[in-house]
Amino acid sequence: MDITGKTRVLGIIGWPVAHSLSPLMQNAALEAMGLDWIYVPFAVRPEDLASAVAGLRTLGVSGFNVTIPHKTAIIPLLDRITPEARLMGAVNTVKREGDDLVGYNTDGEGFIRSLAEDLGFVPAGRRILVLGAGGAARAAVASLARGGAATVMIANRSVARGEELVEAFQGVFGGTQFAAMPLDIPLINAEVQNFDLLVNTTSVGMGETAFEGLDISRMNPAASVYDMVYAPWETPLLAEASRGGRRCANGIGMLVAQGECALAIWTGMEPPPGIMRRRVLAALKR
């Protein structure tokens, strides 16, 4: 790739950001699309966020992704955000529109696309159990409700956090029944058979962590399991689900799909199908 004075710049800001797979998949797509654009990572400490955003604005960067821990903190630094981003309470994509920096959120759409592509799952009329109540859970819950889910149960160690999500969404999505419960394994084991999909939005599953005692065998054999964790590739949760023959998927599909959505926002063009996923899988040796 030749970088010239006309090359347009995209990027990702986060802390840390060296582990991000986004530069690999975005640059693969940009090259395949024949665009004179480049996508680079920017390591931005939390205390430097305001000055970093001001710098990106001044330098004329065309757009950038936003990852942990900046997805909420960046909102007051932008000129405006979309209704989707406001609903999610977070921004993961920023586009320069004239002199303005506009915040978007593609996490929800990426999640729904991944459910369809990786599990063949459509939320309309379905009952879903979501583990966790953080930012990833908020995106999942909102997108599931928008997709017509009948019931969304939020299980979190702090029930109050789960109840906050219930209160945030129950007046917005009248067709979905929301509820919160403790992330207590015996309680979940007693209820898990009532759901068509289980979604883990927590970091449990990374490293040596696991949901000790969670009995996936109680789920309906036709139910599906989605774990947003993708390192390791097969978490203990997914390993147990697959042993029972249930359809399961990790978060790689969501990572790729939200990136595809972001690139379409920046360029006005859809990336070639599969190019981002293939690049990510090659990097992970999958």
Curated annotation (Swiss-Prot):
Gene Ontology molecular functions: NADP binding; shikimate 3-dehydrogenase (NADP+) activity
Catalytic activity: shikimate + NADP(+) = 3-dehydroshikimate + NADPH + H(+)
Organism: Geobacter metallireducens (strain ATCC 53774 / DSM 7210 / GS-15)
Active site: 71
Pathway(s) per entry: Metabolic intermediate biosynthesis; chorismate biosynthesis; chorismate from D-erythrose 4-phosphate and phosphoenolpyruvate: step 4/7
Keywords: Amino-acid biosynthesis, Aromatic amino acid biosynthesis, NADP, Oxidoreductase
Pfam family, one: Shikimate_DH
Keyword Amino-acid biosynthesis on entry: yes
Residues given in the record as shikimate binding sites: 20-22, 67, 92, 107, 230
Main enzyme class: oxidoreductase
Domain of life (superkingdom): Bacteria
Quaternary structure, from the entry: Homodimer.
One Gene Ontology term from the biological process aspect of the record: amino acid biosynthetic process
GO CC annotation terms, alphabetical: cytosol
Lineage, uppermost ranks: Bacteria, Pseudomonadati, Thermodesulfobacteriota, Desulfuromonadia, Geobacterales
Family classification: Belongs to the shikimate dehydrogenase family.
Residue ranges the record marks as coiled coil: none
InterPro entries, alphabetized: Aminoacid_DH-like_N_sf, NAD(P)-bd_dom_sf, SDH_C, Shikimate_DH, Shikimate_DH-bd_N, Shikimate_DH_fam, Shikm_DH/Glu-tRNA_Rdtase
Job of this protein: Involved in the biosynthesis of the chorismate, which leads to the biosynthesis of aromatic amino acids. Catalyzes the reversible NADPH linked reduction of 3-dehydroshikimate (DHSA) to yield shikimate (SA).
Gene: aroE
EC identifiers of the protein: 1.1.1.25
Name listed for the protein in its UniProt record: Shikimate dehydrogenase (NADP(+))
Keyword Oxidoreductase in record: yes
Residues bound to NADP(+): 132-136, 228, 251
